[in-house]
Amino acid sequence: MGLLALGTALDWPDAKQQAHLVRAWGIKQLLEIWNKAKGKERDAMLWGDEIEYLVVNYSKDEPKVLLSLRQADILKALADSKTLKVTGDCAPGTEANADAGNVTLPVFHPEFGRFMLEATPGKPWGIDFKDLLTVEADMKLRRCIAKDHMLSNEHPITLTTFPRIGSPGVFTEPSYPVSGPKLRSQFVPDEIANPHIRFPTLAANIRSRRGRKVQVNVPVFRDENTPWPWKDPTVNYDLHNWPEDDDVRNGAAPDNFIHMDAMAFGMGSCCLQITFQAKNITEGRKMYDQLSPLGPILLALTAATPVYKGFIADTDVRWNQISRAVDDRTPEELGEKPLKNDRWRIPKSRYASNSTYISTDSRLRPEYMDPNLVIDPEIKQQLLDGGMDDRLATHFAHLFIRDPIVIFNEDLQELDLTKTDHFENIQSTNWQHMRFKPPPADNSIGWRVEFRPMEIQITDFENAAFSVFIVLITRAILSFDLNFYIPIVKVDENMETAHARNANLEKKFWFRKNPFPVRTTRRGGSASRSASGTSTPNSGSSRPATPPLGPVEDEYRLMSVNEVINGTAYAKATSKEVTEDAEEGEEFPGLIPLVESYLDSVNMDVATRCGLARYLDLIRKRASGELWTAAKWIREFIAKHPGYKKDSVVSEEITKDLVGAVIEIGEREKRGLGIDDLIGQVPDLEKLFGGFLKGKSPCGGGQAALEQKLKDDDAKVNGVKRKFNEEQ
């Protein structure tokens, strides 16, 4: 998570005095990178994933499950292990392969929570299709190595949040008193955060800059026996340890909301992030733009966060909770008071959805941009004067409206243009759902794009499936020159929609109707590139070479997640409600059919195609509702637990059983045993996984069946394309 430099961290009053200098030096470093790397070319597209784990203390003999705060000890054990050899019962052949040098061992990193670990592959992945099928095994290896360096009762699990973090009583091992000087939280101790000086300083300076504690309020789910209006019973209105304890007496904890008051409730969440290296800056900017509208769709599809602080929430995803947990805006910047000491009103937290498009794509219309975007005009002019184009200068001038939160005194002695520390101080604390990453100062790697919205999934199979899916989408985007542009404010709206309970099934999202590029023929007629890469002229060569653009509002409409992922025809066939928003000629092909059409256009053996089909099939079924999201499964697990009183309370007993089930699923996945024996013991596993953890082949009909399926998918895509062309 961001920079882990060492030094003397400045408290906010001192840091505030140096903020302008850090921004100025950061821009100089950015221009140094820009001028050095703007012409950089890379032959291969590389990518990597980041998996975040919660570490829990769990024993069947103990009455409760706790968060383990031994991150530092675990990381030290991993660092001291010279070879990271895998012992115990990891996947067959793993240790032998590692010893033989055939497996690149993973890298482990600290995170904000002292109960968290982050793991990344030891080297970036390429785009060879067979390599995509090694991702899942690598994720299993990471989890196995981490477990081997923990105590016997410690387990790395991939739940987004620990259900009872911040609940009354003991929820960590070891346990500490709450209301410490850094977080000043009623609910969690300072010791829950990584002790590296960056993390407590980040939390303290966010609070200090705001002038009050962060306010993370999540609507509570109203069940049959939930008191209404509901008042958070864990809030102590009589606490007087710190001035910020007045927050709850001043309305920070409204009725019918679960109230949380510290950065740990956001940055203590786990997620799945994917970073791509583009061949050059142009391709990177294009990927950034085209993946941006997909963010809310994948957020809803990976929903896995229905519980906070021991209560069931009326939302399914983590995004806004993290946004609020690191929101450093002052009352003036929030619009609560007139501007006097601050420069502008800022509509979003520094953890938010994107506010800019940055590509040089000619299809990027001005109407897609945010008309109320806040930028620093002086910084933009500096970037323009330094040779940066207007679009990218606008992007960075927007990021640099923020103050640096953590400043080390040692870094203020002189400007070093061989580093990027001041630039990254601002860049890495703008946590948007996409991040555009310039090369480092030594220019050793290329321009990168980070896809950040997805929730972590319970199993390595699921996390591999979503990782590979995003990679394949980027390949289809670049190969077919797809266009997913919608106004950026509609992406914002979609991000809010994604938070709703069962949003993947019950909500609609703004999405572009026609993703296909329109080409011009030599004779002046228009043509459209098909999903197979060929150019098919349309009838009517008398059409103008460049047809006039219609209203932007005609380019997009509301679609379900099922329709976006699987296509209009599939959604109509599988949904109870017919898609009413699709008028004649507005059928959307679907992301999976587009990906499958791309796969059909490249050389690939059937075994590899079957392996990829297994991942796509999981996503297809999650989108259609045939399989549940993790959020839905967790809700149903709680509802069916004999200890649940239909009062929205997730007790210690329920939490232990839920975490125990997740651990058991992971253990069986690691050993390749499948989950058949758990069905009946753990409710609704078949609705979460179907047959995917039972070892069933996705290509049961053999090569002929697979080839027929590919032809059908390609026909669907081309049929939709033709309809769009006829409407032009």
Swiss-Prot record:
- Biased composition, class Low complexity, residue ranges: 523-536
Q: Which UniProt keywords apply?
A: ATP-binding, Glutathione biosynthesis, Ligase, Nucleotide-binding
Please name the Pfam families in this protein's record: GCS (PF03074)
Q: What EC designation does it have?
A: 6.3.2.2
- Pathway listed for it? Sulfur metabolism; glutathione biosynthesis; glutathione from L-cysteine and L-glutamate: step 1/2
The broad enzyme category this protein falls into is ligase
Question: Which reaction does this enzyme catalyse, per its entry?
Answer: L-cysteine + L-glutamate + ATP = gamma-L-glutamyl-L-cysteine + ADP + phosphate + H(+)
Molecular-function annotations in GO = ATP binding; glutamate-cysteine ligase activity
Any GO CC annotation of this UniProt entry: glutamate-cysteine ligase complex
Q: Which GO terms describe its biological process?
A: glutathione biosynthetic process
PANTHER family assigned: GLUTAMATE CYSTEINE LIGASE, GLUTAMATE--CYSTEINE LIGASE CATALYTIC SUBUNIT
This chain's protein is named: Glutamate--cysteine ligase
> What gene is this protein a product of?
gcs-1
